Every structure is written in C-alpha cells, then in structure tokens.
Amino acid sequence: MTNSSKIRIALLVLVVLVLGLVSIFGDQYTKLVLMLAFLYMALGQFWNLLGGYAGLVSLGQQIFIGLGGYTLAVTVLYYGFPIWLGVLTGGVIALFFALVISPAIFRMSGVYFSIGTWVVAESLAIWFSNWEYVEMGQGLFIRPAKQLSVSQLYYLAMLVAVGSVALVYGVMRSKLGLALMAMRNDPGASETCGVSVFRNKLYCYLISSFCTGITAGVLYLNMVFIQPYKAFGIDWTVALLFIVIIGGIGTIEGPIIGAVIYVLLQQYLSDYASVSMLVLGVVAIIIMLIVPKGIMGTIQEKLGFEILSPRRHL
C-alpha cells in the first residue's frame, strides 16, 4: 500500500469518526439533514452503479424505493416483523421484482430501456393506489418507526451510506466492475472478448435493486408515512439524476458531493416548494455548462485527483 493510499484511508476514517460524533454533539436539525444526505448519497450510489458504470439509464429506480418502503410498512404493521427484518425483506422483494421484470426490460436498450422502467414504476403507482390491502391512495403510517430515536436513525442512515460507498467500490474493483467498465466503453468489443453483457448487466441491476430497497426502508423509517404516488413518483429519479450528474456520473465521489448539494438546496428551498424543482433544474444546467462531467468528474480530469478510484494501477 502506497503512502498516498494510507493518507486517503486515514482521511476517510477521520471523516466517518467526525460524522459519528455529530450524533452526540449535534442538534436535532443537523442530524436530520445529515440523515437525508446519507440516504440520498446511498440511493445516488446505486443509481450511479447502473447509469454511470453499466450504462443502464433507468428512469424507474422509484420502483425499488416504493417496494422497499411498502414492504417495510406492511411487514411491521400487519405481521409484526422487527424493524430490521422489515427493512431486509424490502430489499429481498425489490430484488425478486427486478428478477421478474428483467427479461422484458433487458430486451430494450437506450431510451427504450429508460422509458420501459418508468412505465413499470407508473403501473405500480396505479396498482397500489387501487389496492385495498395497502389502504389504496390513502397511504400507511409506519408507526413502529417512532420507537427509534433520532440518534438511532442517524447511525442507521450513516451505516447505509458508508456501506453503499464500500459496496460500489468493492464491486468496481472486482471482475464484475472490470466487465461493466469494458461494456460501458464498447459493449460490442467486450462481448467479442467473451464478456457476457446480459449476465453482467443483470447482476448489476439486481445488486442495485436489492440495495435500493433496503435504503428505501431506512428512508421511510424517517419519513414515517408512505403513499403510492409519492413512493413510486418520478421525483425520486429526478433527484437521483440531479445528484449523480452534478456530482459526477461514473465516479464514486460524485453522488457524495451531489447528495450534499441537493439536500442543502432542498432545505433552503423548503419554503418555496412551488419553484424548488425549477431552481434545481437551473442549478443543474449551470453546473453542466461549467463542468460538463460534473464536479468530481472535472476535478479528476483536470487535476487527476481521486479519493476512491476503482481503477487498478499496474
């Protein structure tokens, strides 16, 4: 291990320790804001794994957010599951649903894949809005979530965020990661060299869906209430696109930077809900004009600086 690698690891550990101390010394508002940043960071990492590395630009990531949230609500309310098991079950249900729809949506590519995932999400929103079992469009209160303190939720969200970064880094340093980067650069050539494009994209899609479902469960522990058109709404994907694009698509650090910017803007614009999406759109356009590869992508290109590089150096 080089000295620069040791310094980077030490800095990362220091950042995690400082964030951990916020739960002890920070006020409740700071903890709630950081909690949101952690969870959006994780959701951004898992979308980036699809769109940034595998080339699967999904407009339906809210499929797994909604399934994760509703599974948590149903299992803890109707069946008395422990909260941790409800969250884990949400990930399993999301993974199973991804496995079911993948043969159909993987027949599409490019913009058709994007539209196909969005159509599935909209279909689920309509179904859940008319399903009496989940109180239709009225939604469900996740009452057992109130048993958890803000500090407990904070540490749980922080664990999810750190886990998401570690997982994506590990995936991209594995054989699957090498295959994904080869496929992103030239799918035809990589398949000619023996890389199974379908299998590797499927693995990536399943990993992303499972982890998104779990993250959504933790998110809805904080939100307490879930409704179909919110849970399966396109607003989730708009937020994730904003986070990943301005932070730097195809970089591990990008969603971290993007999530912090998004949550801070969201808090600042909370009193201006009617124009918040417009402002976010303008900010995204300005950043894309100034730094087309996103903040971290441009830093890497201009300065060659990376904290968590998935590339292997020979």
Map each language-model feature to its residues.
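Transmembrane alpha-helices and adjacent helix-loop boundaries
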Residues: 1-314
